[in-house]
Amino acid sequence: MKLIILEHYSQASEWAAKYIRNRIIQFNPGPEKYFTLGLPTGSTPLGCYKKLIEYYKNGDLPFKYVKTFNMDEYVGLPRDHPESYHSFMWNNFFKHIDIHPENTHILDGNAVDLQAECDAFEEKIKAAGGIELFVGGIGPDGHIAFNEPGSSLVSRTRVKTLAMDTILANARFFDGELTKVPTMALTVGVGTVMDAREVMILITGAHKAFALYKAIEEGVNHMWTVSAFQQHPRTVFVCDEDATLELKVKTVKYFKGLMLVHNKLVDPLYSIKEKETEKSQSSKKPYSD
């Protein structure tokens, strides 16, 4: 497990975006080998998405051969509703990059058979070869996706009733009116995310500090579902200083001492332009008479 500690939200967002960029470029995706990326919604990943869009517009990172799978979607909210996760992903990420719509996968909260929709989503992930990198965020109560406290740590994609804390937290997106907030959602399970070859969890802000403490310094507990990722062989937690306020000083000092090593994951920062230049140069035959 790695814990990346940056001073501010913007730095944490940029580090995460650089990491995703390097992972995609090093994977060298193509028509026969897509990079599969799990994605979250919410305010935490917005800074990361903005940097990824910037990389795309600069010609450093294409998404043509990337397939995405989103974590969750509300039940009963129209797809074109401004607060649906379809709308969120389109407005904040997908419409700004060159990803093909058929390569973006988001659960349908208006499906006739919701459990069948969840089962089909799991099959789509399998058909794509599994998730290479699943990016996630958490709530103040440590939930990841909509795996609320008490969720099974081996759960799969399913229908979930939202906890009151989550409904209250999401009311700000619905004019502050609780009656407008959906009470159910479709969500990937903890086990679904655990199946990914690598997991990166973004945790920023003092209001997430106790959840990070539970995730890092205490044992695995289904009341804090993010703690399950202690047992994943390749978990990267990316946080800002505010999120470390509940951690022990020696814990923070230990992981900060590893930053010189961990920063090598994003430095050098790879670019598709550089790889294409190297490829063209290596294909040139040396001059001969």
Curated annotation (Swiss-Prot):
Sites of Phosphothreonine modification: 161
Domain of life of the organism encoding this protein: Eukaryota
Gene3D superfamilies (alphabetical): 3.40.50.1360
Pathway annotation: Nucleotide-sugar biosynthesis; UDP-N-acetyl-alpha-D-glucosamine biosynthesis; alpha-D-glucosamine 6-phosphate from D-fructose 6-phosphate: step 1/1
Enzyme class at the top of the EC tree: hydrolase
Keyword Isomerase assigned: yes
Subcellular location: Cytoplasm
InterPro entries named among the record's database cross-references: Glc/Gal-6P_isomerase, Glucosamine6P_isomerase, Glucosamine6P_isomerase_CS, NagB/RpiA_transferase-like
Active site per the UniProt annotation: 72 (proton acceptor), 141 (for ring-opening step), 143 (proton acceptor), 148 (for ring-opening step)
Keywords: Acetylation, Carbohydrate metabolism, Cytoplasm, Hydrolase, Isomerase, Phosphoprotein
Keyword Hydrolase: yes
Subunit and interaction comment: Homohexamer.
Functional summary from the UniProt entry: Catalyzes the reversible conversion of alpha-D-glucosamine 6-phosphate (GlcN-6P) into beta-D-fructose 6-phosphate (Fru-6P) and ammonium ion, a regulatory reaction step in de novo uridine diphosphate-N-acetyl-alpha-D-glucosamine (UDP-GlcNAc) biosynthesis via hexosamine pathway. Deamination is coupled to aldo-keto isomerization mediating the metabolic flux from UDP-GlcNAc toward Fru-6P. At high ammonium level can drive amination and isomerization of Fru-6P toward hexosamines and UDP-GlcNAc synthesis.
Protein name according to UniProt: Glucosamine-6-phosphate deaminase 1
Organism the protein comes from: Pongo abelii (Sumatran orangutan)
Gene: GNPDA1
